From Swiss-Prot:
One of its GO terms (molecular function) is rRNA binding. Residues 1-13 have a biased composition (Basic residues). Part of the 50S ribosomal subunit. This is Large ribosomal subunit protein uL16. Residues 1-22 are annotated as: Disordered. GO terms for biological process: translation. Binds 23S rRNA and is also seen to make contacts with the A and possibly P site tRNAs. InterPro entries: Ribosomal_uL16, Ribosomal_uL16_bact-type, Ribosomal_uL16_CS, Ribosomal_uL16_dom, Ribosomal_uL16_sf. It holds the Pfam family Ribosomal_L16. Signal peptide: none annotated.
Length: 138
């Protein structure tokens, strides 16, 4: 699964996920992409599950790019622990997603195969997504 190799600080504040994606909002590497239209978080497990769904569907063909990286640690306290005594330990990592962000890209497969692969991947993600293709001349 994806997670940072090293971090300057182990824990991070919650923050607010606002605005729309101004970077990573167009298909850059492949021919087709899966674009998020919702705001939210994708965990490393969700990204991996979607990647596996795409890989299984396209079999040996095509090349896949993952355009997001889970670099934000989410900490939780253990069950039945009293409040206080500091912040919990980092449990997993998430990628913060704004509307318009391209999550996956694919090249080397027909459009129908890419559409079906992304439909299967979208079922693994908690956000609404849409299928996009590369703009000619962009």
């Amino acid at each position: 699964m994806l997670q940072p190799a090293r971090r300057k600080y182990r824990k991070e504040q919650k923050g607010r996920n606002t605005g729309v994606a101004t970077r990573g909002n167009s298909v850059a590497f492949g021919d087709f992409g899966l674009k998020c239209t919702d705001r939210g978080r994708l965990t490393a497990r969700q990204i991996e599950a979607a990647r596996r769904a795409i890989s299984r569907h396209v079999k040996r063909g095509g090349r896949i790019w993952i355009r997001v990286f889970p670099d934000k640690p989410i900490s939780t306290k253990p069950a039945e622990v009293r409040m206080g005594n500091g912040k919990g330990n980092p449990e997993y990592y998430v990628a913060e997603i704004q509307p318009g962000k391209i999550v996956f890209e694919i090249v080397g497969v027909p459009e129908e195969l890419a559409r079906e692969a992304f439909r299967l991947a979208a079922a693994k993600l908690p956000l609404r997504t849409t299928f996009v293709s590369r703009q000619i001349g962009a």
